[in-house]
Amino acid sequence: MNTIRVKKMHPDAMLPTYGSADAAGADLYACIQEPVTIQPGEVFWVPTGIALEVPKGCAGLVYARSSMGAKRGLAPANKVGVVDSDYRGEIRVVLLNHSNQPQTLQPGERVAQFVITPVLQPMYEEVEELSDTGRGAGGFGSTGK
């Protein structure tokens, strides 16, 4: 088992937890002192109160919790947040209220999930031509699916 080093930036912060033994993402918690209401179309930067060390060669991805998006219309404004392995600041979740109703966050509420994944960092080479494929430049429905 791997271990991620976590630093509490606030005494009320909660460390990430997994909802089940096989969960891919660990829940991130709102480190707020009182309820916060996010109006429709509004963005709120949710502090988690933690900083952590993503292993070198990996990235931490911040995804919406399915229940937050499906039931309440709250999801990360940038769709997926990327935490690089050399970042040591507080993890914050930029939530956007996509619904037409105000949504209230409670202190300690689970607001996102955090997935650690390996990353490649290839070199980019400029070329005159790319290799041929059956698909070519077809996209956005070109495969008939």
Identify the function of each model-found stretch.
Residues 1-145:
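DUTPase catalytic domain/fold
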